[in-house]
Amino acid sequence: MTTLALAPRLDLMHAEHACTEIRACAGQDLVLDAGRVTHLGALGLQILLAAARSWRDAGLALTIAPRSTAFDDALVLFGLPLAALQSEGIA
């Protein structure tokens, strides 16, 4: 299992880098550390949703932990449950 620390800002300016880093972890279980996230924008959310779908389709686990309060607050504002951004993989 690989752990990847997300940047403090997941927005237009940082989206390409985040996407590249996440794609580089394809094919293995992944933990995204969102503990330092201070801003989650719509594009950052889209990248995380796409990653969750890719990991689910591959039968791999994708977990987001730890999470900052700002990250959790953004999910509430977007109206999405954390489960939409994670994958349990195949047991």
Model-derived features with residue positions:
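STAS-like cytosolic regulatory interaction modules
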Residues: M1-L43, I47-A91
